[in-house]
Amino acid sequence: MRVLPAVLCALALCAACSEPPQKEIDRAQGALDAAKAAGADQYAPEAYTAATSALQQAHDAVAQRDYRLALSRAVDANERALEAAREAANGAARARSEAEAALPPAEASLQQLRTKLRAAEAARVPSIQLASARRTAANAQRALQEARKGIGAGRYLAASAALKDLPARIGVEMKAIDQAIAARGTRRRR
């Protein structure tokens, strides 16, 4: 009597693995598609790649008629895709926060640069010495517009990239303007 349940379980397992686990593969593909829609390829690339790899291994196992391995890989791909979607949500929130936090310092730096440009013009610094600072101000304005547009469209990494090192670049130009104003002032005194 004890042998009969064991034989029935073995037969059930063999029957379950005699066909490709299409339902599980489809579920994993759906989870992978949802993870991509959530931005997992950008915000959780390692988890997304692992899920994609596991799903490919499931397809490879089906091609080799190893349905037990295919089932295992499909379930693994589904779990990894769900994890990638969770990580993507966290990554997107973190990227949004970083992009939004980078806006005020960049805007303040641009405003300071514009103020320095006006002061340099009032001090009659030659226009050619201010050309680089004016280009930087125009580029900074474009970068800020791109960043705002990126944040509005949910492209947080692009927004952060647009603002990367912007205050530092503006700082270099402000220092050059200060030097030009100081040089202009010492020439006047002579």
Report the location of each language-model feature.
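Sec-dependent bacterial lipoprotein signal peptides
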Residues: 1-15
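Long, charged/polar, soluble alpha-helical segments
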Residues: 17-190
